[in-house]
Amino acid sequence: MKKYNFNPGPSILPQETVNNTARAITNFSNSGLSLMEISHRSKDFQLMINETIVLFKELLSIPEGYSVLFLGGGASLQFCMVPYNLLETKAAYLNSGAWASKAIKEARLFGEIIEVASSREANFSYIPKNYIVPSDSDYFHITTNNTIFGTEIHHDIESSVPLVADMSSDIFSRPINISKYGLIYGGAQKNLGPAGVTFVIVKDSLLGNVSRPIPSMLDYRIHIKNESMFNTPPVVPIYASLQTLKWLKTLGGVEEVYKKNKEKATFLYEEIDRNRLFKGIAATEDRSLMNVCFIMNDEYKNLESAFQQFASSKGMVGIKGHRSVGGFRASIYNALPKESIKALVSVMREFEKIHCKGI
């Protein structure tokens, strides 16, 4: 039976990424060695990581004055690495979900944190708006997409202080103006590659302005100086990420994949709004293009488990909602084909016919 992968992360990868990485694990670049065996100091690896950085910058139109890093530790390590490097006195944070909350908790170890707004009272079902960022903040931190609650900031925010963004789950999904940001970070395991590598885009002029000593492993300047090789980098995830970037370029780049993402999300949201069994949980204007969260309508709550089992029997994988929300979550990242969305919609319609009279 065909499987349709809606996992929230690690998640679906382009088939080209899977195939090329599998071949490289057997024999990397005709070296006679596995990708897992090569030295990160070898010429082949140097060429590969340099190509990855060049293509990463090209696809996002990253201007001069910014560095790109590939590190370990996941986005969770960035929750403390960002304030370690940037927070001197105080910083502003927008609390739009679970990951933003965790970032705030870590940042409070380093200085005063101003939570400018939060949607916690509504279980993070919308993106807070109409807040004021103190002009003396060292930076303003946002989480652009919330995988658990299915909300997303769909535009580049204007900020009078350096803007820091966790873009773990929507990087490369839509065009962004890098020059509006001081630092962008994220785990790769949504739209870039497998788990194990973290990307950081940082404006060089922001660094070196805090008075505290920074451990070498947590100092962006050290990693920039050593070209992401201060310690052994995550070789296999970086290679797989390069394959995804190549795939993205063949599609036509970020602008083209953004069009496809809007089409996929619209198709699924329209079915959720039409279908008598289901309803969305996120504010309509803040609905994520990456993570579509929905629950059963109140009168059909007793069918939640039945739909989960029914969908699984039809090949749907990973649609169970997070425990904080319940219901269902379809993660529809760049690599997910529209065919998978159509399959899920077909399952929803079939289930509706079974359980709703007059359909």
From Swiss-Prot:
The modification N6-(pyridoxal phosphate)lysine is found at residue 190. Gene3D superfamilies: Aspartate Aminotransferase, domain 1, Type I PLP-dependent aspartate aminotransferase-like (Major domain). It comes from the Bacteria. Its cofactor is pyridoxal 5'-phosphate. Its EC number is 2.6.1.52. GO terms for cellular component: cytoplasm. One of its GO terms (molecular function) is pyridoxal phosphate binding. Signal peptide: none annotated. Binds 1 pyridoxal phosphate per subunit. The keyword Amino-acid biosynthesis applies. Its main location: cytoplasm. Pyridoxal 5'-phosphate binds at residues 75-76, 99, 147, 166, 189, 231-232. It catalyses: O-phospho-L-serine + 2-oxoglutarate = 3-phosphooxypyruvate + L-glutamate; 4-(phosphooxy)-L-threonine + 2-oxoglutarate = (R)-3-hydroxy-2-oxo-4-phosphooxybutanoate + L-glutamate. Pfam families: Aminotran_5. L-glutamate binds at residue 41. Pathway: Amino-acid biosynthesis; L-serine biosynthesis; L-serine from 3-phospho-D-glycerate: step 2/3; Cofactor biosynthesis; pyridoxine 5'-phosphate biosynthesis; pyridoxine 5'-phosphate from D-erythrose 4-phosphate: step 3/5. Catalyzes the reversible conversion of 3-phosphohydroxypyruvate to phosphoserine and of 3-hydroxy-2-oxo-4-phosphonooxybutanoate to phosphohydroxythreonine. Belongs to the class-V pyridoxal-phosphate-dependent aminotransferase family. SerC subfamily. Homodimer. This is Phosphoserine aminotransferase. It comes from Azobacteroides pseudotrichonymphae genomovar. CFP2. The gene is serC.
